[in-house]
C-alpha cells in the first residue's frame, strides 16, 4: 500500500498489516477502556456501619410506637455508614501485547480510511512560538483536535503546543490508543511512519 505525502507528489510505502487492517470496534473499545482504567487512582474509600464513629447502643425503646431501630450507625440514618462502601482497589485489566498492538493497527487503519491520517515529510518549527504553530496548523486543515506524531521528541514543537489545550504532540514511543481515537486528524511524519511499522509489524 502507498500513501501520499501531503504537500508533495511523493508517496510512502506502508504495510497493509498496519495501515490496511480491518477495524474491530470491540477490540479497540476493550483496549481503550483498559488503558483509561489503568490511569485511575482507585483510592476512593467509604465507611461501612461497623467503621463509622458512634455508639452502637439501641437508639430508642423497642415498644411504644414508631419504627424499630437499633444503632444510629445504620445506613438509613444521616451520618450512618454506607451500605456497599467503596474501598481502594486497582482497576487495571490485563491486555496482551499482541492485542494492544492489533488495536493500534486497527485505529491507524480506520484513520487512514476516514481520511484523518495526514503524512508529512517533516513537522518542524523554527522557534518556540505558539503563534507560529497555530498559523502552521491553520494552513493544514487538521480540525480542532490534531495529534502531531514525530519520530523523536522535539522540544520546540512540544513547548509551542503546550499552551494549546486541544493540540497534542507525541513521539512514536508516547503513542497510546486514547490519543489516537480522540484526535480529529493525526499528522505524522514519514520517518515516524517507518518507526510505527517497526513497532507494530
From Swiss-Prot:
PANTHER family per UniProt: 50S RIBOSOMAL PROTEIN L4 (PTHR10746), LARGE RIBOSOMAL SUBUNIT PROTEIN UL4M (PTHR10746:SF6)
One Gene Ontology MF term: rRNA binding
Protein name according to UniProt: Large ribosomal subunit protein uL4
Family assignment from sequence similarity: Belongs to the universal ribosomal protein uL4 family.
GO terms under cellular component: ribonucleoprotein complex; ribosome
Lineage of producing organism: Bacteria, Pseudomonadati, Pseudomonadota, Gammaproteobacteria, Lysobacterales
Organism: Xanthomonas campestris pv. campestris (strain ATCC 33913 / DSM 3586 / NCPPB 528 / LMG 568 / P 25)
Keywords, comma-separated and alphabetical: Ribonucleoprotein, Ribosomal protein, RNA-binding, rRNA-binding
Keyword Transport part of the UniProt annotation: no
Subunit-level organization: Part of the 50S ribosomal subunit.
Function description: One of the primary rRNA binding proteins, this protein initially binds near the 5'-end of the 23S rRNA. It is important during the early stages of 50S assembly. It makes multiple contacts with different domains of the 23S rRNA in the assembled 50S subunit and ribosome. Forms part of the polypeptide exit tunnel.
Region (Disordered) residue spans: 44-68
A Gene Ontology BP annotation from the UniProt entry: translation
One Pfam family this sequence matches: Ribosomal_L4
UniProt KW RNA-binding keyword: yes
